[in-house]
């Protein structure tokens, strides 16, 4: 969700990473399809 919502501003990867960090992951990234993928 974070990737699609902020894609127009160019901060989708940061929002996705923060979302993952809050969930206890080390970070995350957006796929080409706009899906946020968290790292373990």
UniProtKB/Swiss-Prot annotation:
- Superkingdom per UniProt: Eukaryota
**One GO CC annotation:** extracellular space
Q: Where in the cell is it found?
A: Secreted
Question: Does Disulfide bond count among this protein's keywords?
Answer: yes
Keywords noted in UniProt: Antibiotic, Antimicrobial, Defensin, Disulfide bond, Immunity, Innate immunity, Secreted
**What tissues contain this protein?**
Hemocytes and fat body.
Does the record bear Disulfide bond in its keywords? yes
State the disulfide connectivity: 3-30, 16-36, 20-38
Read off the SUPFAM superfamilies from this record: Scorpion toxin-like
A Pfam family annotated for this UniProt entry: Defensin_2
What GO biological process terms does the UniProt entry carry, in alphabetical order? defense response to Gram-positive bacterium; humoral immune response; innate immune response
Q: What induces it?
A: By injury to the larval cell wall.
Function as written in the Swiss-Prot or TrEMBL entry? Sapecins, which are potent bactericidal proteins, are produced in response to injury. Sapecin C is cytotoxic to Gram-positive bacteria.
What protein family does this chain belong to?
A: Belongs to the invertebrate defensin family. Type 1 subfamily.
The identity of this protein, by name, is Sapecin-C
Species in which this protein is naturally found: Sarcophaga peregrina
Q: What does the record give as the organism's lineage? A: Eukaryota, Metazoa, Ecdysozoa, Arthropoda, Hexapoda
């Amino acid at each position: 969700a974070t990737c699609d919502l902020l894609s127009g501003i160019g901060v989708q990867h940061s929002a996705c990473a923060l979302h993952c960090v809050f969930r206890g992951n080390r970070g995350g990234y957006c796929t080409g399809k706009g899906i946020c993928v968290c790292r373990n």
